[in-house]
């Protein structure tokens, strides 16, 4: 349907003088981004003010123009903050909406603001400014989660639990050591976040549409005013680059993968089949039919939202893969995946930073589980090696002992010394197994024996926590 009589066209687009008829109503709605790019409003104003100050310094616009622009922008900011700004679909996006209102308020000075600038470099600047602020917020929230993990790990540096491989009981570890594994993951995430921030903190403004501008602009002045570390080196790349958005979504995907792994374990541990932890009611929900249920909805949703963030990354990669230089309208589609990834990561981290300190640990259940499944079998093999037996022979001997215990429905620690020697097939070499072996076969002895950097011994866990706090 044609929109020639539509009220949305009462305001002409900034480019409409070239065309003989107004944009079709459906096309107008299809191409407008004002429905989602309003969140750029404050950074758009900041970028415009820095640009205007530079134009005045370079005598491209007058001091009076600058004063008028500053006054008008102050009013626009107040209107937006008060929810009184009238966004116009016909003006397409946040940039033209603000510029139109500015011109309405201050006249010709508003029309001069866009001198030496294109929406191409303007939106690229807004996107970086907005993402930088979001990255800084996420970095703080991620730090809060890391602190929460350190604090909980410190409380449970000596709490014994089973370590698993293939989701089968493998060896005894401490819960603090287990939590510190996630601290390491999230620390790598924090490092990646800092790296990508440093990489994209360059100013695109000044690239104009794609080739730069004929005006004697000072890009370094604008970069300094907006807190950028420098300017983009190539005008074509400046307006068409979305690597930073892709890189953020890659960071977000890896971080959410870590969150998802933690979530999966929280879900398992909360299950009565494990019974290792409990979560506060405020992080769980019930069932509409089963009155006994307490469901771990937060970790389940975090696990599910991980796929959503993966999708945001794939959307951006696909968006960019076939674009020739420089800017194309395709790039309008970069925002919603990025916004979604930022929002999902921030919300997830906030909830987990609040939830982790309130995890109730059921230490007795953890230790009991660690005492099952022959978790100290490797310790027995190591003991035999230290007595002079080759490791493969020791491995085979302990495997025989485990098989014997399975047949008798008992644990290694239930055997007497002579029974243990016989079960290992070493009754003809009694010197290889002495009474001291039973200390090593306890889960406490097993954990305490891992006395090296990165090991699960409580002293080593506390040392790792100390290093972690120093690195925050």
From Swiss-Prot:
Keywords tagged on the record: Amino-acid biosynthesis, Arginine biosynthesis, Cytoplasm, Lyase
GO biological process, one term: arginine biosynthetic process via ornithine
Signal peptide annotation: none
Encoding gene per record: argH
Family annotation (CDD domains): Argininosuccinate_lyase (cd01359)
Entry EC no(s): 4.3.2.1
A GO cellular component entry from the record: cytosol
Principal place of residence: cytoplasm
Entry similarity comment: Belongs to the lyase 1 family. Argininosuccinate lyase subfamily.
Gene3D superfamilies: Fumarase/aspartase (C-terminal domain), Fumarase/aspartase (Central domain), Fumarase/aspartase (N-terminal domain)
Subcellular location: Cytoplasm
Gene Ontology MF terms in the entry: argininosuccinate lyase activity
Reactions this protein catalyses: 2-(N(omega)-L-arginino)succinate = fumarate + L-arginine
Top-rank EC class of the record's enzyme: lyase
Pathway in which this enzyme or protein is active: Amino-acid biosynthesis; L-arginine biosynthesis; L-arginine from L-ornithine and carbamoyl phosphate: step 3/3
Name of the protein this chain belongs to: Argininosuccinate lyase
Listed InterPro entries: Arg_succ_lyase_C, Argininosuccinate_lyase, Fumarase/histidase_N, Fumarate_lyase_CS, Fumarate_lyase_fam, Fumarate_lyase_N, L-Aspartase-like
Short name of one Pfam family: ASL_C2
């Amino acid at each position: 349907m044609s929109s020639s009589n539509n009220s949305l066209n009462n305001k002409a687009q900034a480019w409409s003088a070239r065309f003989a008829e107004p944009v079709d109503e459906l096309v107008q709605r299809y191409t407008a981004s004002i429905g989602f790019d309003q969140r750029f409003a404050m950074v758009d104003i900041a970028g415009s003010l820095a640009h205007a100050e530079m134009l005045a310094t370079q005598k491209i616009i007058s001091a009076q123009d600058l004063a008028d622009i500053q006054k008008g922008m102050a009013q626009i900011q107040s209107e937006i903050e008060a929810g009184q700004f009238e966004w116009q679909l016909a003006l397409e996006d946040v940039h033209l909406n603000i510029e139109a209102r500015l011109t309405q308020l201050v006249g010709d000075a508003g029309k001069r603001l866009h001198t030496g600038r294109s929406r191409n470099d303007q939106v690229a600047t807004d996107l970086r400014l907005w993402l930088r602020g979001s990255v800084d917020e996420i970095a703080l929230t991620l730090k809060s989660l890391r602190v929460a993990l350190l604090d909980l790990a410190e409380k449970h540096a000596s709490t014994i639990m089973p370590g698993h491989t293939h989701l089968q009981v493998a060896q005894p570890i401490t819960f603090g050591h287990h939590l510190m594994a996630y601290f390491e993951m999230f620390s790598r995430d924090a490092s990646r976040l800092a790296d990508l921030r440093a990489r994209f903190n360059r100013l695109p403004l000044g690239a104009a549409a794609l080739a730069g501008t004929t005006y004697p602009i000072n890009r370094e002045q604008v970069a300094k005013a907006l807190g950028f570390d420098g300017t983009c080196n190539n005008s074509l790349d400046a307006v068409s680059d979305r690597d930073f958005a892709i890189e953020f979504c890659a960071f977000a995907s890896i971080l959410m993968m870590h969150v998802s792994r933690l979530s999966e374990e929280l879900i398992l541990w909360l299950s009565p089949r494990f019974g290792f932890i409990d979560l506060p009611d405020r992080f769980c929900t019930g069932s509409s039919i089963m009155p006994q249920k307490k469901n771990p909805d937060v970790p389940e949703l975090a696990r599910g939202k991980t796929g959503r963030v993966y999708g945001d990354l794939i959307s951006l990669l696909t968006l960019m893969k076939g674009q020739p230089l420089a800017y194309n309208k395709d790039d309008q589609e970069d925002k919603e995946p990025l916004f979604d990834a930022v929002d999902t990561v921030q919300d997830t981290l906030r909830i987990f930073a609040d939830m982790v300190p309130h995890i109730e640990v059921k230490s007795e259940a953890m230790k009991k589980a660690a005492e099952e499944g022959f978790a100290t079998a490797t310790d027995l093999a190591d003991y035999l090696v230290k007595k002079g037996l080759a490791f493969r022979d020791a491995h085979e001997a302990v495997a025989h002992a485990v098989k014997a215990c399975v047949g008798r429905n008992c644990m290694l620690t239930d055997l007497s010394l002579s029974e243990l020697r016989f079960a290992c097939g070493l009754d003809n070499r009694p010197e290889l197994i002495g009474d001291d072996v039973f200390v090593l076969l306890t889960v406490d002895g097993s954990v305490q024996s891992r006395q090296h950097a990165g090991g699960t011994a409580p002293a080593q866990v506390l040392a790792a926590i100390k290093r972690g706090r120093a690195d925050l």
